[in-house]
């Protein structure tokens, strides 16, 4: 247990007080619930992602919430709660892909840029500045649309969203690593 006391987020929790501690713990609990819902989606969701009937009876379309469908159903007769729970899994995959890819690519490019310098450094920084000049959400949406050519495959959707978010966040890692290398 002594090993964990020096972890940055444990120190932050121990040092925070009042409203700051409440907000920090609330955020951690929400993230924990989200991650657990994504991991245990097959156990938590009452129906599968695309299930539109149970016991041979089709679900009603656009049904209001009731005991069987806690959040109602969609136009296509799909359970909304099940789709929300399964969607958290897709979101978690996308987050993992984009964070890992951004971290590795940004660190690699930052090391190259800071170490070699010169014309390569100027080009990489100019590209990073160009990416910064666009609104990040708009850039990510446009890139995801351009990259998603699979027509509905969950893997293709996760990868296109992950790559588009990666492109938006790479310049941040690049700048931080580059500045540390150049010191």
Q: Regions from the language model: what does each represent?
A:
Residues 45-52, 149, 179, 183:
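Perimembrane helix-loop junctions in membrane proteins
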Residues 1-107, 111, 133, 141:
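Gly/Trp-centered helix-boundary motif
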Residues 70, 74, 105-106, 114-115, ...:
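Generic hydrophobic transmembrane alpha-helix motif, especially the helices
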């Amino acid at each position: 247990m002594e090993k964990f006391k020096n972890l940055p987020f444990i120190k932050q929790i121990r040092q925070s007080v009042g409203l700051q501690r409440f907000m920090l713990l609330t955020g951690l609990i929400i993230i924990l619930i989200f991650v657990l819902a994504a991991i245990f989606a097959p156990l938590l969701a009452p129906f599968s992602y695309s299930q539109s009937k149970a016991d041979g009876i089709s679900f009603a379309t656009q049904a209001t919430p009731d005991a069987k469908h806690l959040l109602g159903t969609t136009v296509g007769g799909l359970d909304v709660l099940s789709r929300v729970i399964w969607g958290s899994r897709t979101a978690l995959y996308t987050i993992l892909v984009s964070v890992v890819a951004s971290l590795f690519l940004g660190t690699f490019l930052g090391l190259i840029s800071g170490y070699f310098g010169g014309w390569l450094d100027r080009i990489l920084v100019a590209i990073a500045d160009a990416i910064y000049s666009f609104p990040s959400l708009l850039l990510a949406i446009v890139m995801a649309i351009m990259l998603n050519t699979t027509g509905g495959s969950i893997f293709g959707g996760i990868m296109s969203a992950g790559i588009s978010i990666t492109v938006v966040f790479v310049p941040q890692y690049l700048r931080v690593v580059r500045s540390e290398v150049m010191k």
